[in-house]
């Protein structure tokens, strides 16, 4: 049913995936990392959970921020949205009108910029481009506020609602050419919740049968079904052949078995490949030059 689908799509387990990706990207890029994480909701009421032992039950700006902060990745994190801005206390804000409030027991503070919204958006964007923030978390509404930054070299799409056009717009944030870094290569991360088939059965007898006859050759995921449709219009190198193709089939690492160990294998291989940005650039350059499109 639709309620179950929404629950799976916004699975809190994705917070662990975001942390794992961030850790991997920090290890690969260090201070050169410019990671943007886009999501749907802010949830300011969760600010009270920061620097506490409380767990989160949904994916939103605050839960993503705190999950990464607790991981102690030795990077500066920022939050940018229409109603919530979080910045490291160490950043000098003396050249801009603002109000700020420290977040207890952390190195961060909430900031309220005085004046038009776009001024704060532009200011935080500049901090990001200058490397004073390595990981920036925001809502997809940023796309409608005139914010753009070609320095993005890692994008996590933790946004679970919206149209195909919006998905393309978000991807476009990462693939822009950066005149300050002509050799830039960006990773774009899509999060997928995979669940057993029996969860999608309506009758108890159907659920029991699906549980007993669990088939790990098939990938059961509402998330993945959406992603497959979107990948039909995304071009990229085939992971095995190297030719530039559309469709999710080009990501040849995604193969059965789709049990817990199989999914972990896929994730490990994805993380390993993502760290080699040079190889990604080589595949694009070689195949585009040769005209090897499929």
Regions found by a protein language model. Give the residues of each.
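Conserved C-terminal RecA-like helicase domain
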Residues: 1-135
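Conserved nucleotide-binding/hydrolysis micro-motifs of P-loop NTPases
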Residues: 42-44, 84-85, 142-144, 161-163, ...
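Alpha-helical scaffold elements adjacent to nucleotide-binding pockets in ATP/GTP-utilizing enzyme cores
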Residues: 64, 151, 166-173, 226-230
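Conserved beta-strand termini and adjacent loop/short-helix elements that scaffold enzyme active sites
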Residues: 80-82, 191, 244-247
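A short acidic, often aromatic-flanked loop/helix-cap motif at beta-alpha or helix-coil junctions
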Residues: 84-89, 196-199, 249-254
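A short beta-strand element within the Helicase C-terminal
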Residues: 137, 142-160, 169-171, 184-191
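Conserved segment of the helicase C-terminal RecA-like domain
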Residues: 167-169, 173-224
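Long, largely alpha-helical accessory region at the distal end of helicase-like NTP-driven motors
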Residues: 205-294
């Amino acid at each position: 049913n639709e309620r179950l689908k929404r629950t799976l799509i916004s699975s809190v387990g994705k917070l662990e995936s975001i942390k794992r990706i961030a850790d991997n990207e920090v290890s690969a890029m260090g201070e050169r990392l410019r990671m943007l994480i886009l999501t749907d909701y802010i949830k300011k009421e969760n600010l009270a959970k920061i620097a506490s032992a409380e767990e989160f039950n949904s994916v939103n700006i605050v839960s993503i921020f705190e999950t990464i902060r607790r991981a102690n990745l030795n990077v500066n994190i920022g939050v940018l949205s229409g109603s919530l801005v979080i910045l490291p206390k160490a950043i000098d804000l003396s050249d801009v009108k603002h109000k700020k409030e420290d977040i207890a027991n952390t190195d961060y503070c909430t900031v309220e910029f005085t004046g038009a919204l776009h001024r704060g958006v532009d200011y935080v964007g500049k901090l990001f481009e200058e490397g004073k923030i390595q990981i920036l978390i925001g809502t997809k509404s940023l796309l409608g506020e005139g914010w753009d930054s070609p320095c993005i070299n890692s994008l996590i799409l933790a946004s679970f609602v919206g149209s195909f056009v919006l998905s393309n717009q978000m991807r476009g944030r990462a693939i822009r050419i950066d005149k300050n870094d002509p050799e830039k290569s960006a990773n774009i991360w899509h999060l997928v919740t995979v669940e057993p088939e029996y969860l999608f059965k309506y009758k108890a007898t159907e659920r029991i049968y699906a549980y007993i006859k669990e088939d790990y050759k098939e990938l059961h995921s509402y998330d993945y079904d959406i992603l497959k449709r979107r990948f039909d219009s995304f071009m990229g190198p085939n992971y095995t052949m190297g030719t530039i193709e559309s469709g999710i089939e080009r990501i040849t690492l995604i193969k059965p078995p789709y049990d817990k160990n199989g999914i972990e294998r896929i994730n490990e291989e994805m993380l390993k490949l993502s760290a080699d940005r040079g190889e990604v650039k080589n595949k694009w350059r070689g195949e585009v030059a040769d005209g090897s499109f499929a």
